[in-house]
Amino acid sequence: MTTTEVTPRSAGTASALTRTHSLRQVLQVQSFQILLVLLVIFLIFAAMAPEVFPTWGNVRQIIQNVSILGVLGIGMTFVIVTSGIDLSVGSNLVFSGVVAAKVMQSMGDTGWGTAFVGIIVSVSCGLGWGLLNGVLIAKAKVPPLIVTLGTLGGALGLAQVITGGVDIREVPAVLQDTIGYGNVPGTTLPTISLIAMVLIVIFGIVLHRTRFGLYTFAIGSNEESARRVGVKVDRQLISIYALSGALAGVAGILSLAQYGTTAIAGQSATNLNVIAAVVIGGTSLFGGVGTIFGTVVGLFIPAVLQNGFVIVGVQPFWQQVAVGAVLVAAVYVDQRRRAAAARGHSAKDDGRTRLFGRRSN
Amino acid sequence: MTTIPVLEARGLTRSFGNVRALDGADFDVNAGEVVALIGDNGAGKSTLVKALSGNLALDSGQILFAGGEVELTSPSHANSLGIETVYQDLALAPHLNAAQNMFLGREIPKPGLQGRLGFMDNKAMRLKSREAFDELGATVRSLSDPVGSMSGGQKQAIAIARAVAWAKGVIFLDEPTAALGVVQTRNVLDTIRRVRDKGVGVVFISHSMPHVIDVADRVQVLRLGRRVATYEAKRTSVEELVGAMTGALDGAQS
């Protein structure tokens, strides 16, 4: 360890260095790359359909379509950063929406009072499922894949039991008019998108700036180490799955407002779409790495492809093919980048594997 | 030994199924002294360290900290008494940077409302981390790169610096030199002496007898879950230590 050479330099420039590094953390390489991919896709469609595609009306449509998935993507990012998974978000959304619709239906009127109760009920239902997930994962030590596969079935099944399998189509008009189709007063920005954006910003700050976020990364990075240094890992995991659940509850009421129906059968692939977006956005399934920003970009790629294909007259089914390819490519690029980083470092500061053999210089 | 040991274990037992990992083990370390804890594989060294760092519940036995009996229920409880451990696997989070690892679980909150909302004073933590690394002469080039991309020596330095910075009473080092080259090993041994000189009790676990004799003040030998011998490091030899570890000296001892 040649201390004298190195320390003064890094001590002197420490604050300047860290500034650029924290910026780099926010715009992590992969989420930045994927942003470029998104821009390229956007420009290609804009060139192919300059009259229709790049208009605010169309972009607004895309933003509106992505909003609900965006709310789910926040929770999923937290969960996947801990190297967990939450398959239950779609069913949880349906269940929360169904219970909220039932309660609002039984209250009869269609005013703000009813809508407010519906919001509370929906978020509480989502939170409940999330807590159940969290307790089973953190305390009962059942793997997240299995727990949330179980609650995926449980929530959807119960939603069908409650409704008899028939969608509820009575949703208070105020919800539909203001949140579902309404714009932010004075603008043409959908209210539902503003809600999603506010949540994205808040939880982006929570993930990247607060202790809660730091512990989320620490658990995903090395759960045992986190435990040993005194991070309350169980409590943190429960909170994270509860957050994911509560956001699914938020998405449940937003979905009701937007579509005016509980759409019980309409969310069967939502969980996988959200997971794909999170991973495309550069969050590692192995934990410890991820950004909310990347997730948002990851959500826009499928949405832009879908929208663009319809506009340029390609069968929209191609969207699934394209998203599949982007997903695999994103993970491939990430793997290569990490492998290259490991090799690059091994020239001077090798990884532990090489340390045993040839550490003589 | 008229002084009260800063940490003392009396008759610790712990079984895993039919295996008695600790079988009435005693142990003690004074402030400002390096105690080497040696023993063959399976002698109970790691189990003893786990018990004394709050990572393991005991079947029976007493742990005394500065003369008062304590029950170490969790690692954080041990930490709050000033007992720190450098684990063999270092217990770092590879995706976090050096400063974040340094303060993980003990972050400095920002003052006022922001702190209560969970915002951290990253600048203060970086400054203090840098001070801690400089104090140890540790080569940590970047405080903001993920620890996972650093060399084994740097990771080790971070883990040791973290323990040293927080240790007020006792510091356990579990095989700190096992994966290190010659230069880094000497650095770690120097660090151990420096920490001892600050008045902290250092417990040094190692299989390397020359290092043990080099750095330790006393050597305590564990065999089959029990302390079988204590030596003054200056008046012992590698042969004697190995004999005590393996039991070859049993006949010769009174």
Question: Could you say what each language-model-derived stretch is?
Answer:
Chain B
Residues 2-254:
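Glycine-rich phosphate-binding loops of nucleotide-dependent enzymes
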